[in-house]
Amino acid sequence: MFYDDDADLSIIEGRKVGVIGYGSQGHAHSLSLRDSGVQVRVGLKEGSKSRAKVEEQGIEVDTPAKVAEWADVIMVLAPDTAQAEIFANDIEPNLKPGDALFFGHGLNVHFGLIKPPADVTVAMVAPKGPGHLVRRQFVDGKGVPCLIAVDQDPTGKGEALALSYAKAIGGTRAGVIKTTFKDETETDLFGEQAVLCGGTEELVKTGFDVMVEAGYPPEMAYFEVLHELKLIVDLMYEGGIARMNYSVSDTAEFGGYLSGPRVIDAGTKERMRAILRDIQSGDFVKKLVANVEGGNKQLEALRKENAEHSIEVTGKKLRDLMSWVDRPITETA
């Protein structure tokens, strides 16, 4: 684990950082780098709606190509599915020996969608939290833990540069963990698919369907399997599974011990292993690339199918009753 005393901020202060993208992480990195005294510019395509936001913050914005030409450290924070094209068209033609190419996620490098030249440092700085939290913690004098990894190190100074960058966005205040592009990418994808997004979503929808098909009102089913999920996750987030079990009733705890293994059994574990193998082998990324090359048709079809599930209809009606819940723009428009 690395902390403030392990990182030299002057290293990144002596470089010119170009941040490609201004989404959740892009804005947090750019603003915090600026506040740490680092020269920073943001690369966005012509016509991007985010250009005005960058300019309002007093940061210079230009096209990705021009920013890549100016910078000697380029942090790629565009969406995963856009990175390979941006690299090929805008970044690679402007890379110079001694430049550093940084990423917030290792997918494109690990699976060979981006192949940087050998004379460029390739590293990753990945905060383990959303951009708004990264920025808020930085402003409060704190930080969000970060992962760093060095995939290519022609100068032998890649780790020091990555640590310096992490310090500039507040990461070393909380702690920085050294990893590899392989481990960060594969664990991140597995967590998303098997548990956080895919697994949780299907568990919730299936629980809802079972209750409604058994004759219970959909409103009650929604409260029990989706709405109250936040209460449980918050307890786990604060103090782990033990804290959650301590906080719920004995009835809930006892029932969970008995029934949880009936839902998630050895067969589930084997299917999770199959998902991990698909990730490790590159099969998932091949499907991801095929979807993008096909115009996102598969993704759009899956979105439509999920949006039409009855739990979404029920949920929208119930959230109209919850003044304390922040409503997404799509529901309030």
UniProtKB/Swiss-Prot annotation:
The active site lies at 105
Name the protein family.
Answer: Belongs to the ketol-acid reductoisomerase family.
Cofactor(s) this protein requires: Mg(2+)
Source organism of this protein record: Mycobacterium ulcerans (strain Agy99)
Protein name, please? Ketol-acid reductoisomerase (NADP(+))
Amino acids binding Mg(2+) 2? 188, 224, 228
- Which residues bind NADP(+) per the record? 22-25, 45, 48, 50, 80-83, 131
In this chain the KARI C-terminal knotted domain maps to 180-325
In terms of superkingdom, the source organism counts as Bacteria
One term of GO molecular function: magnesium ion binding
What taxonomic classification does the UniProt entry list for its organism? Bacteria, Bacillati, Actinomycetota, Actinomycetes, Mycobacteriales
Q: Name one GO biological process term.
A: isoleucine biosynthetic process
The cofactor note reads: Binds 2 magnesium ions per subunit.
Q: What is its EC number?
A: 1.1.1.86
Any Gene Ontology CC annotation: cytosol
